[in-house]
Amino acid sequence: MILNKEIETIILVANKNELSFTTENKSTFIYEIGVGKVNALLSLATLYEDIKALGINPVLLNVGTVGCTRYPIGHVLYPNYYAQGDAYTDGFFLENTLFLKGQGVIESVSLDKFDYEEALLTSDRFINVNTAFYQDIKHLNPLAFDMESYALANFCLLKNLPFHSIKIVSDNCDGTVKDWESILGEISGRLGTILDEFMRDRLVKEKIDIPSVS
């Protein structure tokens, strides 16, 4: 499918092979953004130019997998806070750091109003609880870890785009990808149902009329 004026929802996925699903919904567009913050940002910036050229205002929905130490594999998360996961954010570096909140409308909040325990931390690595890096941040007890969401949410804040995310726990940050690899098939099979439920129960509350994707 080609992006067109009929598109109402754009589903952003890091890799179409990671979450393999299709949709016959002509108002839904699936867009691959690549893995990592830089790839995600560059891909979304390119997509944004196409969105502007068409004069449309779609909802952006990021769907993907996360590492999580608090919930079992297969658990579905709807993050409401986003932060850098591997950048130094102390002292004067805080002046250039945004802490983001929201599903739909994204806003920047002060650190004292930011809830790390409900936050998705974005970094360019698989998180391993046995590393020194994790030891430095484990006191924050974050909701989960991914590789794209903060960059996407930040861009949507700057461009005033509606942004939502659905994340599925694929590994428990144990230092291997064995859980991630084995869960992908099960996740792909559930994805259509998960998206339908999300659009019906959450997006409709915002008075956005979006048809089923499954």
Language-model-derived ranges and their functions:
Residues 168-214:
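Regulatory input/activation interfaces that engage signals or partners
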Residues 23-31, 133-139, 172:
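Glycine/charged-rich beta-loop-alpha catalytic/anionic-binding loops adjacent to active sites
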Residues 69-71, 86-87, 127-130, 154, ...:
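Short, well-ordered, mixed-charge alpha-helical segments that flank or form enzyme active sites
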Residues 91-159:
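Active-site rim beta-loop-alpha module in soluble metabolic enzymes
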